[in-house]
Design a protein with these regions (language model features):
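Protein-protein interaction/assembly regions in multi-subunit complexes
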Residues: 1-312
Length: 312
């Protein structure tokens, strides 16, 4: 992958300007970042795979609270909402997995008490202290315990299981086509951008550079797992169908685009993602050794993402 290069890797700290009257709401532990970098000589499938993976396909640590571990005499508190709220608290990803958190509080005032995450912290802070967990009525009490768990962002109802937000992948070497301009030099269908600028924001739970390298490592592992599934391919003459359960458009698009680039004479190569489960199906019409085709495509992609990791 000597022609592939990563350039202009930039990280900007996103420090909010907060009025003095709102200083009590300012972040205390986490610092958000905006990361931008450019990949030269790669396909849109590669840049899009990184974008998709950093947004929702990395496993993310979060605070998990069991329903039974929430005990309160406040009738306005709904345990399910507290569970959801706890999941939404951004948590440092280097938090030891055996870390336990607990909260035991009574509102002895005459006003509604906003309970902040500061009340959860014991020792080293792993999240901001100024996030409101719940509002406790006068004279009421609450106890809860939480532990560190992890989940993927694409799983529904798991709140803050993401490391990057507002991620974009924009081509820099091809002018976007105007569909209404009949005099346009080239239609987007025929363009093949090879320079991609990737930009994303973080919530401060993991350094930007580590997010990118983790995404590349994640994609490499998923590609390697495809090699172990080649024996499951169904075929009819020279038509081959490979279904990858537990994966998404990310891998499907990567493989089909790479097959198309490495084997331009292949008769047909398409993929489709299931609408009801996490699975992607690849269909290829090829007259020679199909295993060699897949192995070459996967090895090429593995080298591509290793090269990106080394240059970050």
């Amino acid at each position: 992958m000597s022609n592939l290069s990563v350039k202009d890797f930039k990280i900007v700290k996103l420090i909010p300007k907060i009025p003095d009257r709102l200083k009590h709401l300012a972040p205390t532990t986490l610092t958000s970042e905006r990361c931008t970098f450019t990949i030269h000589n790669c396909s849109n499938a590669v840049s899009n795979a990184i974008r998709r993976t950093i947004m929702c396909e990395l496993k993310v640590a979060y605070l998990h609270t069991e329903y039974e571990d929430i005990v309160t005499d406040d009738p306005f508190i709904i345990p399910e909402m507290i569970q959801k709220r706890m999941r939404m608290i951004p948590l440092l990803q280097n938090t030891p997995p055996d870390t336990k958190f607990s909260l035991d509080i009574t509102n002895n005032t005459l006003d509604v008490l906003d309970v902040k995450t500061k009340s959860l912290i014991r020792g080293k802070p792993y999240f901001d202290e100024t996030i409101t967990i719940l509002s406790l009525q006068p004279g009421k009490s609450l106890k809860l315990s939480a532990r560190v768990a992890s989940e993927y962002g694409y799983i529904p109802h798991y709140g803050m299981c993401a490391l990057a937000f507002n991620a974009t992948s924009i081509c820099k070497d091809v002018t976007p086509s105007n569909m209404y301009d009949e005099a346009a030099e080239s239609k987007s269908h025929f363009s093949d951008p090879r320079v991609w600028e990737i930009t994303f924001n973080t919530n401060g739970t993991m350094p930007s550079k580590q997010i990118v390298t983790s995404a590349c490592s994640n994609i490499i592992d998923r590609l390697k797992s495809v090699l172990s599934l080649l024996y499951t391919m169904a075929h009819n003459d020279n038509q081959y169908v490979l279904t990858i359960y537990g994966d998404s458009d990310t891998i499907g698009n990567l493989l089909i685009k790479t097959i198309d680039e490495l084997y331009p004479d292949v008769e047909a190569a398409t993929y489709s993602a299931s609408a009801i489960e996490r699975a992607v199906t690849l269909r290829v019409i090829y007259g020679d050794d199909i295993n060699t085709l897949y192995k070459n495509a996967i090895e090429h992609l593995i080298e591509t993402f290793k090269s990106i990791m080394e240059q970050i």
